Amino acid sequence: MIENQIINNAINFIFSHIDEDLNVETIAEFCGYSKFYLTRIFKAETGESIYSFIKRVKIEQSAWRVKIEQGRSISEIAEDYGYSASNYATLFKEHFEKSPAQFRKENSESAAAGFFTGRENTLETYEE
C-alpha cells in the first residue's frame, strides 16, 4: 500500500508543476525514492510511463486552456507547457485527432450553444 501513496504523491506533484519542465529525477527526489524505483512502480500501478503520463496531462490541460482562453494564441498556450507551436500541434493532433485550431473552433461553438441551452433548461426547472 505504500506504493499507492508514492504514486499519489508523484501524481499530485506532476499536477502541481505541470507547467514546468518536469523530469523523473525531480519527481523521484520529491517522493524520496530513486528514479528507477519510481519509474517501475509508476508503470506497474498506472500502466503508463511517467513521461507518457506527463505528456498526456500537459496536452489535456492545455486543451482546456485552448478552449477557454480565446484571447490567447495557441502558440502562447503551447509555450506555457514547454512546447514549440509545431511540436504542440503534432502532439495535440495525435491525442485529439484534430488540430488545436479545429478543437478551439468546435468547442467554442458548442460551449456557447451549451451555455445558452443550459440557462434555458435551468430557468424552466425553476419555473415549474
Model region roles, listed by residue range:
Residues N8-E25, A44-Y81, N107-E127:
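Terminal helix-turn-helix DNA-binding modules in bacterial transcription factors
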Residues C31-G32, Y81:
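Core residues of bacterial helix-turn-helix
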Residues G32, Y37, S52-K55, A101:
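Short alpha-helical segments used as structural interaction elements across diverse proteins
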Residues S34, S49, S73, S84, ...:
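Short coil/turn motifs that cap or connect alpha-helices
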Residues L38, F42, N87-Y88, F92:
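Short hydrophobic/aromatic patch on the recognition helix
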Residues G82, K93:
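Gly/Ala-rich beta-loop-alpha elbow adjacent to hydrolase catalytic centers
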Residues S86-L91, K98-Q102, E106:
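Long, mid-chain structured domain cores
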